[in-house]
Amino acid sequence: MTKASFRAAILLTSVSKMAFVVRSVSRHAKLRGGLLMNPKTVKKALKDAIQAMTDYKWLFSARPGKDNTRNRKFPFQKVIPFILAFRGGTLNHEIMDFFGLDPSAGTSSAFIQRRSTILPEAFESLFHDFSRSVDENKLYRGLRLLAVDGSDLQIAANPKDPDSYYPGVNGQRAYNLLHINAMYDLHQHIYVDALVQKSRKADESAALTAMVDRSAIESALLLADRGYESYNNLAHIQEKGWNFLIRIKDGTAGIASGLALPATDEFDVPFHLKLTNKQSNEIKELLKDKNHYKHITNTIRFDYLPRTSRKYDPAVFFELHFRIVRFPISDTACETIITNLDASAFPLHDIKRLYAMRWGIETSFRNLKHTLGLLHLHAKKVEFVLQEIFAKLTMYNFCELITQSVVIRQAQKTHTYKVNFSDAVHICRQFFLGDVPPPILEAMLMRYILPIRPGR
C-alpha cells in the first residue's frame, strides 16, 4: 500500500467519518434478525467487534505500516481487551490481573509505549460498532426514548493545554477538565453516542446537534434538561423527524420569555412559530405577533436560515411546531416543558412521566464514573484518557445488556427484580475475560438482585 493510501486511511478515522469506518469494518457483528439477546450473544458481539478491528488494525495505528505489525508482548489484539478490562487499580496490578503472575509479561512502561501506537478513535469506533450490533431498537409507543446530557471529567493538570486547564485556587490543585456529551437509550439502558470536548471549548448544543444529525435512528423522542434550550436545537431535532421534550427556563432569558403565555401554574399551549433573521418594516409589523413570529439575531446560531442577506432579498422563514406545557411540582414550584409530541396522544400526565424518565442518564453517569471506574484513570495524556472514556462506555453497555437479560420475577409476582449493577460489573468483567461460563454467570448474577420499585 502506498504512503498516500495509508494517509487516506487514517483520515477516515477522524470523528466526522468514523461511522463509515465502523460500517465498513464490522458488518458481521449484528445481533438483529431474530437472535435472542443473552450473555453469550452479547459477549460474541463484543469479541467480534474487537476481532474486526484487529483485522484492520492499520486503520487505527498512529503510524500505519510501522505500528502494530509485529507480535510483541502487548499485541494489538490484547491491548484492546486489556484497556476494556481496567478495574481502577495501579497499572502494574492491572497487568498482573489480566496477564497473570507471569515474570515474562510486559512492563507498565512497555504497555504505555504500545498504547501510544493506537489512535483514540480505535475505542470510539469499537464503542459505536458494538453499540450498533446489540441495538434491539426497543420502542416506547413507536419511539426510541433517548436522553442527552453532559458530565465533566477531571484529569491530570497540564498547563500547556489552555482549552481544558484550570489553575488551582484557594489551596486547591490545578487540573484539566473534559466534558463528556452522551446520548443514552432509556429503554435499553445503553449509550448510543458520545462526544468529548475540552471544557473551556465545550458546547453542549453543538454536541447535541452533531449527535442528532449523524444518528441512524429513524424515530425517537429526545429528552433533555434546560441547558439544551435553543431554537437551533429544536430545529435540528424537528428536521431529523424526531420528537423533543426539553425542560426550559421560566424566567426572562429563555424561549418562554419571548412568548405570551398564560399566567397560571398549569397550561398546555400549541405554537406554530415562524423564525426569520430579516428585519424589514414589513417583518417588524409581523413580529408584533410574538406567538407566531420570532426574530433570530445574527449573533445567535441558527443553521436553517441564511447567515447574511442583502436589504432587498426576500425574507426567509423557518417554521417550528411545538407545545409549551407547565405544571406544578410542589406548592411553590412549577416545571415548564417544550415538546412537539402530539397533544392528543401525549397529554399532560404523559409529559410529566416522560420527563421524569430523563433521570436515567444521570444514574448512568454515576455508574460510569464510580462503578465502572472512569474516575480512576490510568493516563495523563488526553489521547490515552479518550481511549479509556470510550472503553468504559463500551463496557458499561456490555454490563447493562447482560444484567438486563437476567431479570427475575418472584413466583408470587410481588416484585420484578434486577441485578445489583455494582456486583454485576465485577461478574461481567470476569465473564468478558473468559473466566466464567454463561450458566455460572447467570447463577452468580441471580445472587445479587434488588426489587424494582415503581416510581423510584
Set out the residue ranges of the language-model regions.
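Conserved beta-strand elements of the Class I
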Residues: 144-146
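Extracytosolic and intramembrane catalytic regions of membrane-associated proteins
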Residues: 166
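Short Lys/Arg-enriched helix C-cap and helix-to-coil transition segments
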Residues: 121-134
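Single, function-defining residue in the core of a domain
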Residues: 8-89, 97-98, 105, 110-118, ...
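Short boundary motifs at domain starts and secondary-structure transition points
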Residues: 134-139, 328
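Extreme N-terminal basic, low-complexity initiation segments
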Residues: 2-5
